[in-house]
Amino acid sequence: MKSRSLQSKLFLAYISLACLILFSFAVFFYAFVSRQLKDSQISAMNTLNSSFQTQVDSAIRNLDAVSVNINYSNQSKTILDKSFNLSISSDMLSDMSDLFISLSGTELKADQVNLYDFSGYVLEAGISTIVKKTDGSKDEWIEAARELEGKKVLTPPYCTREYTKSATYDQWFISLYRSFNNQYKRSVGVIETAKQCKSVFKSIITYKKKNHEDAASVYVFDSNGDLIYPYDISQEYKAALQPYFELTKGDDSALTLASPLSGRTEYAAEAVSSYTGYTYLTIQPESVVLAPVYNLLRILAAIVALFLTVSIFISYRLSRSVVKPVKHLKHIIQRMELDSLGQEKVTAYPVSV
């Protein structure tokens, strides 16, 4: 019974050692590989943010450039009256639309250019080319541009059918407003340059289409913290995504956060444009980032189970091989007499040399 107890102890010791080694390796493997995957994913998301920011900034700079060029063009100043004021009429349409198109360039830096006077008229050129009375829907932005005296005013994405011929579907635009000044730097009107959102956010849209379900979530917030991409979603969904902006307030460009939508752990990378003030937030769930680790762990678990089975067999054989000589020696000692120690005695118990 005692020999069995000794064998059991040895067997458990061997098995415990094997399990400790295998478990330590599994923990190290998980910690090391998951860390590498996390760092790699965050680096990739930072690269994505940089490319998104570069493309969007370029689109906004193009709108800005067209606006500035119109403001400083000598040809645009010829439409002013003798008092150097702007009074839009249909006679200006042909010349000014040609000017706007030429300043926009062959790349169509702006899809639509509008020039407003302070009498309630607008000259439109681009997708829509017309002179008409304004409807007052843009008075807020016109007034904001007047107050900033030449500085740009960026609108959030807005939906309109104003420039669609059939008026049966919506288009999303971003506009840049700037005051239009005469030769004496006095504001006499407002310039609006507009671009469709699908062009402004082209790089993000292309990335999402190419990667489908594997694509990271991309959110863009303006300097006020309002969500501007994705733009064509419901107000309820926008409100649900708003907490993401609060979670990004900090010094780190790489974050680990809990999703406001699902509560799951997510990895995020952010970038802020000094030109537009936009914050780009790219997010990937931890379960997606660590999916390769989980797959490898399943393979590792099968290998560990195999090694453990082999270890059990080897441990059993080793424990028996150690206990057998001890048991043998025990029987020899039991057959020896204390007073005959040192004398050779013949026994029936076979002794191997």
Each predicted region: which residue ranges?
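Extracellular/periplasmic ligand-binding regions of membrane signal-transduction receptors
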Residues: 61-95, 116-128
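Membrane-proximal alpha-helical signal-transduction linkers
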Residues: 320-344
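Cytosolic-side ends of inner-membrane transmembrane helices, especially those
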Residues: 13, 26, 30-31, 299, ...
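Extracytoplasmic/periplasmic ligand-binding sensor regions of membrane-associated signaling proteins
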Residues: 105-106, 119-195
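Extreme N-terminal signal-anchor transmembrane helix of membrane signaling/transducer proteins, especially
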Residues: 1-43
